[in-house]
Amino acid sequence: MQYQKLILFLNWRIGIVLKKLNYRFKNMDLFKRALTHSSKSENNYERLEFLGDSILDFLVGEYFYLNCNDDEGKLTILRSHYVSENYLVKVFDALCLQDDVILGKSYQGEISKAIKGDVVEAILGAIYLDGGLDKARKFIYDNFDLKNYKNIIDDNYKSKLQELIQGNFKGKIAYETVPCEGNQGGFEANFYMDE
């Protein structure tokens, strides 16, 4: 009787996750692998994450190529934002997957940002293998707020400075980062230019 309750609970839980993903897997092994951390099994999400990472880069790049008239530099900034670990964590959290990742007993504590990002990429890789590129594209369009790209702020100040200098001066650029005393994690950035 306990075993039947466990099976019912697991099937219910799987149904909830699939509903969140808005995708029905034909191959449930891919789905399970996409959620399985290496601390639990050798049959884990690492290879799916590798594939999903490439597909994510491609499909986000494709979206901006087709929908944004900005130059290559701006397109690169936009793509970098949406494929970043920080953005993948937002997608993971929005999908409420924290209780669905399968971890081994050796894993302690909260799920790290890196694992959250890896799981999103692994799910994308699994959807691609199971349903093809159009289904992977739909997953991205449903879960990544690509249409609001105009709200993305470019806060890569080092790149901005480099573009400004290279556009107006000729010379080599060098950077130096010096830790600040007494300020844990703080630093001073120095910029040098050879005229």
Residue ranges of each PLM-predicted region?
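Double-stranded RNA-binding/processing signature
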Residues: M1-E195
